[in-house]
């Protein structure tokens, strides 16, 4: 189906190749899993197999790539290739350009010239499969990250292409949604579709995979069966080596840093937050869980003034967020967005970090020291002059964190902090958060990653339908342990927990 022969690729302004001498054959009906560390070349390989490198991005390409025994360069661009290959990008938001969810799905179908009856059949089918029927009239920009991924997946599935490429396409989905995607992919494989899954965490799909390709620094390090990969994964450098945290039952008296009373937020007629109350104390490390669309991101956007309450009150460090300018709030609160690309717009890595510092009056040598420290903390030292868009998704995630911690806000909020990071990098990120907590920072993390919740969180808040439905607060250590155990048991039973 797809064959790469001695393929090497270098982005236009890059000095080092992102792919080196790749030789790979993907058979018709195969489900191929591609994994590796951040910046290993996974996304670049996916873009190559979709024809996007050759027909859209350009750069230096050596070697050959063929699709169905035809050189990729012979196709009439993406217009022709997209009839055979569908791809869900690691940044689902970049695929969503229409005013409603329904229009996102209809646009591709209408461009294919299907009859009205067939269009409606496919629309209804993928909306049911991806469980987004209730979002039909919603504007994509109002959706959560996980909901956006569902819409991008639905729009791609509706086209029923021979090849489906998923690049970190489940990274922001809750447990139940990932389970649903697994079922859909299993059915597509039985229908002899060719499926390529690119992800740091492929464990959820090993059961239906045929082969695992392990990339390292742009080269194929190994190709294994799923069984062989699973057998050795605990001994590879992809696996986190951290020990689990010990829960402390003792807490010093902590002062409230966040106080929320009767908070309601609406998108049109939809209540994203519903009369919510919450208090966060100084020095806590809190995990916020919930299904896609439960209100997690909407909640944290109120803490730095990106959203103002529809009704109710939000106070941060005694400041009413409805009355305090954003440039004052960011001195106290740093928010790392769910999608790091929404934070990155400068020409170099160091300029990205400098931007926030300059906005709060930190310049000169003081800014230089802060930039150097933050980049070293996130393992990006040496990339100061790199164009941020040339970084991998995981590196961009770390850069976004560097931009926030450089300003040293007391409250650090991370919306899906481990998206795009492999297990080792995820652990390194959380060790950094623990270090910052010990320095006196308060940490809030919105996450679906139950392992980091189990290993690092002191308090767990679970949301559903814009409300807080569980909170292991008030220093109840035994209650907290039971809460974690309950969450794990529900996950094992197939419940929609996160």
Curated annotation (Swiss-Prot):
Q: Enumerate the spans annotated as ABC transporter domain.
A: 2-242, 258-490
Q: Which UniProt keywords apply?
A: ATP-binding, Cell membrane, Membrane, Nucleotide-binding, Repeat, Translocase, Transport
Signal peptide start and end residues:
none
Q: Which SMART domains match?
A: AAA
Q: What class of enzyme is it?
A: translocase
PANTHER family named among the record's database cross-references: ABC TRANSPORTER ATP-BINDING PROTEIN MA_1418-RELATED, HEAVY METAL TRANSPORTER
Its name, as the record gives it, is Putative ABC transporter ATP-binding protein MM_2387
């Amino acid at each position: 189906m797809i064959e790469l022969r001695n393929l090497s690729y270098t982005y236009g302004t890059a000095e080092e190749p992102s792919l080196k001498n790749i030789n790979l054959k993907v058979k018709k009906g195969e489900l191929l899993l591609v994994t590796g560390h951040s910046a290993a070349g996974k996304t670049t390989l996916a873009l190559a197999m979709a024809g996007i490198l050759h027909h859209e991005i350009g750069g230096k390409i050596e070697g050959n790539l063929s699709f169905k025994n035809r050189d990729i360069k012979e196709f009439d661009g993406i217009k022709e290739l997209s009839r055979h290959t569908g791809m869900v990008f690691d940044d689902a938001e970049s695929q969503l350009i229409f005013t409603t969810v329904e229009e996102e799905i209809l646009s591709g179908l209408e461009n294919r010239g299907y009859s009205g009856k067939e269009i409606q059949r496919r629309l209804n089918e993928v909306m049911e499969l991806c469980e987004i029927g209730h979002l039909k009239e919603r504007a994509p920009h109002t959706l959560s990250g996980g909901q956006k991924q569902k819409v991008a997946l639905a729009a791609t599935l509706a086209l029923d292409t021979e090849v489906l490429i998923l690049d970190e396409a489940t990274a922001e989905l809750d447990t139940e949604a990932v389970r649903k995607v697994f079922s859909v992919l299993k059915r597509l494989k039985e229908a002899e579709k060719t499926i390529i899954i690119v992800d740091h965490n492929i464990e959820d799909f090993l059961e239906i995979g045929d082969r695992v390709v392990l990339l390292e620094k742009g080269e194929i390090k190994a190709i294994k069966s799923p069984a062989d990969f699973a057998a050795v994964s605990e001994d590879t450098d992809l696996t986190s080596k951290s020990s689990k945290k010990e829960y402390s039952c003792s807490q010093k008296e902590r002062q409230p840093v966040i106080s929320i009373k009767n908070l309601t937020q609406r998108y049109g007629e939809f209540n994203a937050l519903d009369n919510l109350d919450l208090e966060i104390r100084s020095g806590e490390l809190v995990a916020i869980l919930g299904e896609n669309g439960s209100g997690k991101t909407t909640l944290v956007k109120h803490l730095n003034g990106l959203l103002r309450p529809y009704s109710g009150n939000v106070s941060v460090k005694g400041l009413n967020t409805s009355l305090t300018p954003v440039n004052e709030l960011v001195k106290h609160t740093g928010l790392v967005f769910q999608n790091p690309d929404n934070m990155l717009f400068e020409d170099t890595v160091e300029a990205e970090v400098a931007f926030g510092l300059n906005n709060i009056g930190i310049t000169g040598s003081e800014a230089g020291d802060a930039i150097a420290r933050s980049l070293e903390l996130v393992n990006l030292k040496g990339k100061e002059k790199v164009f941020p868009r040339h970084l991998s998704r995981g590196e961009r995630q770390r850069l976004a964190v560097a931009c926030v911690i450089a300003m040293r806000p007391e409250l650090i909020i991370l919306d899906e902090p481990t998206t795009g990071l492999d297990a080792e990098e995820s652990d390194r990120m959380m060790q950094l958060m623990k270090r910052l907590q010990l320095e006196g920072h308060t940490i809030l993390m919105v996450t679906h990653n139950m392992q980091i919740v189990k290993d690092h969180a002191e308090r767990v808040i679970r949301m559903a339908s814009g409300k807080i439905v569980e909170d292991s607060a008030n220093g109840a250590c035994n209650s907290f342990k039971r809460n974690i155990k309950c969450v794990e048991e529900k996950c094992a039973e197939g419940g929609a927990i996160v």
